[in-house]
Amino acid sequence: MKLQIPAGKANPAPPVGPALGQAGVNIMAFCKEFNARTADQAGLIIPVEITVFEDRSFTFITKTPPAAVLLKKAAGIESGSGEPNRNKVATIKRDKVREIAELKMPDLNAASIEAAMRMIEGTARSMGIVVED
């Protein structure tokens, strides 16, 4: 199962509790382990892929934060534009896009850093963020 949880803030309340409860996972054990693994990434949303086994034990893999979350943090904005084609909400430099692309590289299916940068730039465009050199 896949969830997106704020780093270091997993607790048994929804959405975490019900999703794990259905699978019969020890919710507190997951929360403690997740919070310990993501404590250094406070403020970001971390996608996590949880594998639950027959005996109700589990493993999980944390992914890199979504590109949109990293772009919002880099641009210092609360949310993207409602009309990205009409009103732009922020501007970020291309080297910042490279940083984000390098961070996201393990989770993107891009062959090169340039291809990853193009993906991140596309996300930025769809959020109303202008990328400049």
Swiss-Prot record:
InterPro entries: Ribosomal_uL11, Ribosomal_uL11_bac-typ, Ribosomal_uL11_C, Ribosomal_uL11_C_sf, Ribosomal_uL11_CS, Ribosomal_uL11_N, Ribosomal_uL11_N_sf. One of its GO terms (cellular component) is ribonucleoprotein complex. SUPFAM superfamilies: Ribosomal L11/L12e N-terminal domain, Ribosomal protein L11, C-terminal domain. It comes from the Bacteria. It holds the Pfam family Ribosomal_L11_N. Keywords: Methylation, Ribonucleoprotein, Ribosomal protein, RNA-binding, rRNA-binding. One or more lysine residues are methylated. One of its GO terms (biological process) is translation. One of its GO terms (molecular function) is large ribosomal subunit rRNA binding. Part of the ribosomal stalk of the 50S ribosomal subunit. Interacts with L10 and the large rRNA to form the base of the stalk. L10 forms an elongated spine to which 2 L12 dimers bind in a sequential fashion forming a pentameric L10(L12)2(L12)2 complex. PANTHER family: 60S RIBOSOMAL PROTEIN L12, LARGE RIBOSOMAL SUBUNIT PROTEIN UL11M. Belongs to the universal ribosomal protein uL11 family. Forms part of the ribosomal stalk which helps the ribosome interact with GTP-bound translation factors. This is Large ribosomal subunit protein uL11. It comes from Geobacillus stearothermophilus (Bacillus stearothermophilus).
